[in-house]
C-alpha cells in the first residue's frame, strides 16, 4: 500500500485542528494506516525544543536552526520510518511553516532556509499540503477565544499578515501540492473540499 505524507499549514487561528481530525477519520474509513504528528515537536527531543521555540525570545536565525534540528530528528525518528513501512503521516506544520514564519514573518534569508531544507530533507516532501487561509481579522478574533497564547500568536497584526502573504506565495509556486482552503467558510463546505482532494490523492 502506498503511504502519503500530508501536511497542514496556515496562520495562527486559521482553524487547522478541526480539519486534521476530519482527515484522520477519512483515512480510518478508507482503511489507510496513519500516524498524526506535529511541528515543532513530534519526538521527545522535539517536544522539549517546542517549549523553547514557542515561548522564549531568541534570534530568528537561532530559531530557524532549532526548528530544523527538531525537524531532522522528527524525520529520522517518525516520518521516514513510517512512510517506508506504508504508514501515512499527517503533520500539523512542516517546513512551509519555517518559510512563512521565520522568513516571511521575521526576515530570515530565504536562501538560508532553502539550504537547510536541502540538507535535512531533500528527498522527503509532502504529497499534499492543505493551507488553511482566512483574513487576518478573523484569525486574530479566533485567537482571543482560545487557550493561553504562545509568542507567535501574540505577535502584531503586521507579523501575521506577512506570514499569510508568505504562505500564499509558497502555494502559488507549488500549485500541484498545495490545496488552499478558505477557512472562513462553513465546516461542512471545507470538509467537502478536503474530501475531494483526498479522493484524488488516493485514487
Model regions and ranges:
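Hydrophobic positions on the alpha1 helix immediately C-terminal to the Walker A/P-loop
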Residues: 19
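Hydrophobic anchor at the beta1->P-loop junction of P-loop NTPases
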Residues: 8
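ATP-dependent small-molecule kinase phosphotransfer cores
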Residues: 30-121
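Conserved lysine of the Walker
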Residues: 16
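NTP-dependent small-molecule kinase module
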Residues: 24, 137-203
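Walker A (P-loop) phosphate-binding loop of P-loop NTPases
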Residues: 13
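A glycine- and Lys/Arg-enriched "phosphate-lid" helix/loop adjacent to the NTP-binding pocket
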Residues: 98-165
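Pre-Walker A (Motif I) flank of P-loop NTPase domains
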Residues: 2-5
